[in-house]
Curated annotation (Swiss-Prot):
Enzyme Commission (EC) number: 3.1.1.29
RNA-binding as UniProt keyword: yes
Site (described: Discriminates between blocked and unblocked aminoacyl-tRNA): 9
Name of the molecule in the record: Peptidyl-tRNA hydrolase
Gene that this sequence comes from: pth
Organism: Syntrophomonas wolfei subsp. wolfei (strain DSM 2245B / Goettingen)
Catalytic activity entry: an N-acyl-L-alpha-aminoacyl-tRNA + H2O = an N-acyl-L-amino acid + a tRNA + H(+)
Subunit structure as annotated in this protein's UniProt entry: Monomer.
Amino acid sequence: MKMLVGLGNPGKKYSHTRHNIGFKVLEELARRHQIEKEESRYDAIVGHLRINQEKLLLVKPLTFMNLSGKAVRPLFNWFKLELSELLVVYDDMDLPPGTVRIRASGGTGGHKGMQSICESLGSRDFPRIRIGIGRPPGGAIDWVLGEFSESEKPLMQDAIEKAASAIECWVKSGIDASMNAYN
């Protein structure tokens, strides 16, 4: 079993914002593969599906971004997972828009949702996929809570699809194969 966490903020108000790109990747995976079961558990929506017979949990924390660890840790413990079985997808202002980067571990890059997860798990040693949203011309909060422009939308849709494919590769062949194929 593997757990995929897409970071975002709950509610319609935030559904199309840059900060919710992690949720969008989970939605793309749910579109590609049939969800067997969906439940609300530990401050998160959890979808269950299979890719090549591997059970995958799609987790959307219902806490706000900065408290994502509050939802992730109890699920991680409940399902008795190893750090290598967790993958987190999130936005990154330090990458150009539409860029997808896969890593086996790493820092938080100042991302509050990742900081919360790393603190709650007591480790940064788990796979992650960062999706570039670019640097803001103004304030960071307005940028991440803003929606993509019409010209950005096709680029971001390509990134969502690429990230979903990278996750499928991770499930089937591991993080090294995913990094080699999609970085």
